[in-house]
Amino acid sequence: MTRDELHAAAMALPGAHMDVQWGDDHVYKVAGKMFAATDGAYSNLSFKATDIAFEALTEAGRGRPAPYMARAKWVVLDDLAAQDAAEVADWVRTAH
C-alpha cells in the first residue's frame, strides 16, 4: 500500500481527519479518537484491530503488537509498501 492509498482510504471514512503528532507521526482520528497512525515516511502502520485480526496478524508474523497499545489490540505492520492495499484499507475501515 502506498502513502496516497492509505491517506485516501483513511480520509474517505466518515468524520475522519489526520493530525501530525509526536514529531512527525500522522495520526488518523474520528471524534478525537485514534484509529490508525503511521510515521511521517508512511513506512509502517499501526491500527486498532479486532480480536481475531490481532491474533491472526501477530501469530502469522505479518504484524506485531504495537508498543504501549498492544493491550488495546493495536497492531503494527512494519512494511506498509509490501501490504495489499485492499486488505489494509479494510483493516483501517474496521478500526474506524
Label each region the model flagged.
Residues 1-96:
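Charge-dense, helix-prone N-terminal extensions
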